[in-house]
Regions:
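A structural signal for multi-pass alpha-helical bundles of membrane permease subunits
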Residues: 3-277
Length: 277
């Protein structure tokens, strides 16, 4: 009886897995295949493989959408935001774990509240604050927003990892005359590579793919990111879906490369966090 129930459960689970997998894979399949088709081929058979693949869509989209400028703005904001998050979160996590007093525990618990609050909820108050600080419509304003919005998640990653590092390493370095800053940056931080890789990929992906926050915080005066630029391109190319799909692939390319380059460290960070955290 249990075997029959188990088989039914497995079939339902597999069917649901397949259904949800198709929901995610079909749009990806369409974006990739249609980016290599002409407009006529897309209208004729949007789900078919390209019979005569062409790279003209990418060339035209690259020049027409000014992808180079969009890449530059997005890379500047993403790299700066991720670097700021890693620096602040790792040092804060180190102090919280090593001090381990009531104040640090309270501040850590207070910081984790941000995980339960979606960044979009804080968008309007953040816009008001940035306007008061004269940072609205400036890349530095968006940088500050990301630093606050994703601080909770990043410090959560680092505290779990640093907690697994023996304090005896610090004590030995103190006996040799090393300062706290030297101990952290020369001994502790190099041990955080798996956690840092996880943070880089997660934060980099979220910030690179973010659309709503750059649209409102940067506006149209401080330069467009890759997502807001693609949004404007879609408005201009509603009758040229081959260019729309090419733009989407060009926007996704850097994140795919980042993941492929850091895949080993990313998986190591996830498994280490699961075992040690």
């Amino acid at each position: 009886m249990m075997t029959v129930k188990r088989r039914i459960f497995d079939r339902i689970r597999n069917a649901l897995t397949l259904a949800f997998g198709l929901i995610y894979l079909i749009p990806l399949y369409m974006a990739v295949t249609n980016s290599f088709k002409t407009y006529a081929d897309i209208i004729k058979s949007p789900l078919a493989l390209p019979t005569a693949p062409t790279l003209d869509n990418f060339v035209e989209a690259f020049h027409a959408s000014n992808i180079a400028s969009l890449y530059g703005t997005s890379i500047l904001i993403t790299v700066s935001s991720v670097a700021l998050l890693i620096l602040i979160s790792s040092t804060a996590a180190y102090v919280i774990i090593r001090r381990n007093n009531g104040i640090c525990k309270f501040l850590y618990a207070f910081a984790l509240i941000g995980i339960m609050v979606p960044p979009v909820v804080t968008l309007v108050p953040s816009i008001k604050t940035l306007s008061m600080l004269h940072l609205l419509y400036k890349p530095s304003g968006l940088l500050m927003f990301y630093g606050g919005a994703y601080f909770s998640t990043t410090i959560f990653l680092y505290t779990g990892f640093i907690n697994s590092i023996p304090i005896s390493l610090d004590e030995s370095a103190y006996m040799d005359g090393a300062s706290t800053i030297t101990i952290f940056f020369r001994i502790i931080f190099p041990l955080l590579k798996p956690c840092t890789a996880t943070a880089v990929i997660l934060m980099g992906m979220w910030i690179w793919n973010d659309f709503l926050n750059p649209m409102y915080i940067l506006g149209s005066t401080a330069g467009r990111t890759i997502t807001t630029g693609i949004y404007n391109a879609i408005g201009a190319y509603t009758s040229q879906w081959n260019l729309v799909f090419a733009n989407v692939i060009l926007a996704s390319f850097p994140i795919v490369i980042l993941y492929l380059c850091m895949q080993k460290q990313f998986m190591s960070g996830l498994t280490a966090g699961a075992v040690k955290g």
